[in-house]
């Protein structure tokens, strides 16, 4: 991304923002409410248009046919409204629509993705009766299923017999409705995707979760990246005070050695 700029009325949402997302890395995007975090994800996905340049997997965003790009990039929004009485497994199956892998393969993938989010027992439950956290996990399974692909796509060809091309997974506050164990399960799953070679971008508000799981943290404020680096480099008491207006204590846990913010 180069020089992304987006203005709504008199409000500058993104201002000359430049950023590279790297394969094999879990990047956490932090910032106060209303600073453009969700907007940035929508610009990357193509849902919103901004001035500037966005390239996906080395190609201009505009050159990617939507059905092909859907096999390489998936986004989990903050909320996903769905009022139809689908079963949970049918919601996850929506992630397979860009593919032509066949019913048998899709069923295996759907089951695997439900297991990845700890929701296999919900497979035959009606989506509309699930709790908010359960719905969030089902939609996470859906985007995982969307990226589960044994072949690789490029703008020029429908299929190429290579399995190494990275994908882009974007998650907008994926832990907001989850209990403690499922928060960690979700981020551990995202972390595994990064370890497998994908680029993963996650919006969080919990600084301790960010410190624990991020390879890289981006701090967004006033439409610009204010800091970019490791958790240790970005999450300093001075910077937290500056951006979040909060006097935080930042230290390493004496037993685990993990960075901790309180």
Curated annotation (Swiss-Prot):
Residues 1-247 form the ABC transporter domain. Its EC number is 7.6.2.-. It comes from the Bacteria. This is Hemin import ATP-binding protein HmuV. The complex is composed of two ATP-binding proteins (HmuV), two transmembrane proteins (HmuU) and a solute-binding protein (HmuT). Part of the ABC transporter complex HmuTUV involved in hemin import. Responsible for energy coupling to the transport system. It is found in: Cell inner membrane. GO terms for cellular component: plasma membrane. InterPro entries: AAA+_ATPase, ABC_transporter-like_ATP-bd, P-loop_NTPase. ATP binds at residues 31-38. The keyword Transferase does not apply. It is a peripheral membrane protein. SUPFAM superfamilies: P-loop containing nucleoside triphosphate hydrolases. Keywords: ATP-binding, Cell inner membrane, Cell membrane, Membrane, Nucleotide-binding, Translocase, Transport. It comes from Plesiomonas shigelloides (Aeromonas shigelloides). One of its GO terms (molecular function) is ATP binding. Belongs to the ABC transporter superfamily. Heme (hemin) importer (TC 3.A.1.14.5) family.
């Amino acid at each position: 991304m180069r020089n992304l700029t987006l203005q709504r009325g008199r409000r500058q949402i993104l201002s000359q923002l430049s950023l590279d997302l790297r394969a094999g890395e879990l990047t956490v995007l932090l910032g106060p409410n209303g600073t453009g975090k969700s907007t940035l994800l929508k610009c990357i996905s193509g849902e919103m248009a901004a001035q500037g340049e966005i390239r996906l997997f080395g190609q201009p965003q505009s050159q990617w046919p939507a059905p092909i790009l859907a096999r390489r990039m998936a986004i989990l929004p903050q909320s996903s409204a769905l009022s139809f009485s689908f079963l949970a497994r049918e919601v996850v199956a929506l992630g397979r629509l860009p593919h032509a892998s066949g019913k048998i393969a899709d069923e295996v993938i759907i089951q695997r993705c439900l297991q990845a989010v700890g929701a296999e027992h919900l497979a035959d439950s009606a989506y509309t009766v699930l709790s908010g956290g359960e719905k969030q996990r089902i939609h996470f399974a859906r985007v995982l299923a969307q990226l589960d692909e044994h072949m690789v796509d490029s703008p020029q060809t429908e299929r190429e017999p290579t399995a190494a091309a990275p994908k882009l997974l974007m998650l907008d506050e994926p832990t907001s409705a989850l209990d403690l164990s499922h928060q960690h399960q979700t981020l551990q799953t995202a972390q595994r995707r990064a370890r497998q070679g994908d680029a993963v971008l996650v919006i969080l508000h919990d600084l301790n979760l960010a410190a624990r799981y991020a390879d890289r943290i981006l701090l967004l404020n006033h439409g610009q990246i204010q800091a970019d680096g490791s958790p240790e480099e970005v999450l300093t008491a001075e910077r937290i005070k500056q951006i979040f207006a909060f006097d935080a204590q930042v230290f390493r846990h004496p037993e685990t050695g993990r960075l901790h913010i309180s």
